[in-house]
Amino acid sequence: MVKTVMIVGGQRKNLPFFWLAEFPGTERGKMYCQINAGGLYGLQSYVAQVEVDISKGLPCFDMVGLLDSEVREARERLRVSLHHINAALPAEKITVNYSPAGIVKSGTSFDLPTALVILAAQGKVPPERLREVWAVGGVG
């Protein structure tokens, strides 16, 4: 049995608090991968992470996080770009998470890290090679 550690938050005396809870018997998707990315918020840069989970289920492409419309349009840019390098999106449930959650992600600078992390989750790029990579850029 695989245990997943989740962070649970709440309010106690007007102060946020967090604790770790373990849920036995839950597994992540068979293909999970993460990459470091960066973005701009006004004139300030910030560190971000792009995570993908490819799992069995109805084929869909979900993007989670505080995203601008330009980032949401990445679905089609990624589909076309991956098709041109003979690496089509899998016919499975793809969930892409952009963090940190409190900052609006905008622009096309998240296209490249999203493409790389999808390729790594499919096994077409070794996931261990992405651990020390920072990716920012568009695809076309």
Residue ranges and their predicted role:
Residues K3-G140:
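Peripheral, non-AAA+ core regions of ATP-driven protein-machinery
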